[in-house]
Amino acid sequence: MKIVIASCHGYKIRETKTFLKQLGSFDIFSLTDFPNYSAPKEIGCLPEENALAKGLHAAKELNSWVIADDTMLMVPALNGLPGKLSATFAGEDACDKDHRKKLLQEMQSLESIVDRSAYFECCIVLASPEGKFFKARGICEGYISNQEKGSSGFGYDSLFLKYDYKQTFAELSEDVKNQVSHRAKALQKLAPYLQNLLEKQLVSRN
């Protein structure tokens, strides 16, 4: 069964591809395989809105089942920021390091783990060319370190520590992170729908 991961981000593609391969025989593609495809601009205030818009658009344009996701980092002490600005927190043209630097600056006066609490919220949508979709949500709670640690991952990974873990997401191995992350939790909830699609395809072939 053909399925397209609606992302050009290497880490997201790897994590999702690893998960899909564990489920069954998917022919897996990503947006890097469709250089002429133009994704819609993210304008939603919630991960669910952006993931759904991306998924439905890509599924229709590429005539394929699609997996799309959107993730936001929320810091309650900052009234939910970065939130919908997670990808542009330090500006439209800023890089991940700039966003992390701004977050640390905004949290300078916050010292306790309670005050520095944060969580990632991820919504993943499985969408069909006909407009049918399934969605799942994953949350990972933790707190923001007072300095960057680790060189793996992307985004805010080098600042985020999951509760009960002593390493940031950027210090964890991909295998470990892929079991406990917000994206992993959302993907696991989608597993029954994906397996059902595979079973239906096998039946139709026979």
Curated annotation (Swiss-Prot):
Binds 1 Mg(2+) ion per subunit. It catalyses: XTP + H2O = XMP + diphosphate + H(+); dITP + H2O = dIMP + diphosphate + H(+); ITP + H2O = IMP + diphosphate + H(+). One of its GO terms (cellular component) is cytosol. Signal peptide: none annotated. Gene3D superfamilies: 3.90.950.10. It comes from the Bacteria. Pyrophosphatase that catalyzes the hydrolysis of nucleoside triphosphates to their monophosphate derivatives, with a high preference for the non-canonical purine nucleotides XTP (xanthosine triphosphate), dITP (deoxyinosine triphosphate) and ITP. Seems to function as a house-cleaning enzyme that removes non-canonical purine nucleotides from the nucleotide pool, thus preventing their incorporation into DNA/RNA and avoiding chromosomal lesions. Belongs to the HAM1 NTPase family. This is dITP/XTP pyrophosphatase. The lineage of its organism: Bacteria, Pseudomonadati, Chlamydiota, Chlamydiia, Chlamydiales.
